Amino acid sequence: MSDVLFIEGGRVIDPASGVDGVRTVVIRDGKVAEVAERVERPRDARAVDARNRWVTPGFVDLHVHLREPGQEYKETVATGARAAVAGGFTAVCAMPNTKPVNDCAAVTELVLARAAAAGLARVYPVGAISRGSNGEELAEYGELKASGCVALSDDGRPVMSSALMRRALEYARAFGLPLTVHEEDLHLVGKGVMHEGAAATRLGLKGIPSQAEDVMVLRDIALVELTGGRLHVAHVSTAGAVRAIREAKRRGLPVTGEVTPHHLALTDDDVGASGYSTDFKMNPPLRSAEDVRACREGLADGTLDAIATDHAPHSAVEKDVEFDAAANGIVGLETAFSVCLGLVREGALTERRLVEALTVGPARAFGLPAGTLARGAAADVAVLDAAAEWTVDPARLHSKGRNTPWKGRRLAGRCTHTIVGGRIVHEEGKADR
């Protein structure tokens, strides 16, 4: 069989290259060989019929929880990678809050070995900012980078010590690593479990004010100005955080940010509308309609660089409990494109900006070799049917997690083919490869 693959007749949307039009993508030896309007295909060459579909660079997710090692009952690198390619993601960044925490080469190498064995999405490990993510002593950044980490985070745990955060930014700068930070002041969070506002009052639940995020974002931007380190703000959820990042960028500071599909599409009112469903409990919590508008505007104008899922699978035991006691987080790799395509239909985003925020935007934020269909780039591609409608059935997801707020929702937009390094690793309607 020929080692050449043709993706024919689709609308190629590649913001990194400025391409948007019907083209044929030619893949040879795992690389993009050509993107052209007219290409003659040899008889023995494999082909994907992409007529009436979008063809984009494979999606890049800067924020996923693959749970391995230590929590394989929730997810494994293999099941998470399978969910990723089913959603069009060809590269994912694995957060370090595993058991043990990824604060050393041994854990990083294990994650990479599991990813290689799965042979699906590319997995980029994120190392811990502090040893054990305990916020007391910095991890060995040189060791983490040398073993394959592309960024650093104590994800799920804010770095409460300003002195430690300063040292982390300085130390990470020496290795060219961004810090991707969960921003919340735990003193303001207290025992809160949802956004502080009228909805929390009606539901009788303790609230978390938006300012818990805002003050930490402002602090860390000030520390970036002091140190010159690179800051990436994880899962932005407040209007104040968007304003702070916008101003930091205006001043030329090395600050980037991401936002999740759920913080773009849901509000704190959905907690009550769902009947206290724990599939609507996450951290940061679903915010007010004003915050959602600000996040949408921030994504549309480029203040926020990337859409990231914060894919966080949990077992039923951890979710089928009272709202106060339930684990935070939802799965999102397989629904992200569909949910965000809804924003395009609402007029909140353009098609180009949606693709940009799923591809070259995140790739640039972390300096990853991804997010483009330029000649010579790795042939990581998503083929998408933007018109296809489907109903979310948690039992049919590839992830081990079933914790999705989109259960039973009718969504539009499916990934029909995912290609990694020139190999078709996902084809809708066919058995897993």
Curated annotation (Swiss-Prot):
List ligand-binding residues for Zn(2+) 2: D155, H182, H235
Q: Which Gene3D superfamilies match?
A: Metal-dependent hydrolases, Urease, subunit C, domain 1
Q: Which organism is it from?
A: Anaeromyxobacter sp. (strain K)
Q: Which reaction does it catalyse?
A: (S)-dihydroorotate + H2O = N-carbamoyl-L-aspartate + H(+)
- Pathway(s) where this gene product acts: Pyrimidine metabolism; UMP biosynthesis via de novo pathway; (S)-dihydroorotate from bicarbonate: step 3/3
The source's superkingdom equals Bacteria
The UniProt function text for this chain reads: Catalyzes the reversible cyclization of carbamoyl aspartate to dihydroorotate.
- What is stated as this protein's family in its record? Belongs to the metallo-dependent hydrolases superfamily. DHOase family. Class I DHOase subfamily.
According to its UniProt entry, one GO biological process term is:
purine nucleobase catabolic process
- Which InterPro entries does this chain map to? Amidohydro-rel, DHOase, DHOase/Allantoinase_Hydrolase, Dihydroorotase_CS, Metal-dep_hydrolase_composite, Metal_Hydrolase
Q: Which HAMAP family has this protein been placed in?
A: PyrC_classI_B
According to UniProt, the name of this protein is: Dihydroorotase
* Bound cofactor: record note: Binds 2 Zn(2+) ions per subunit.
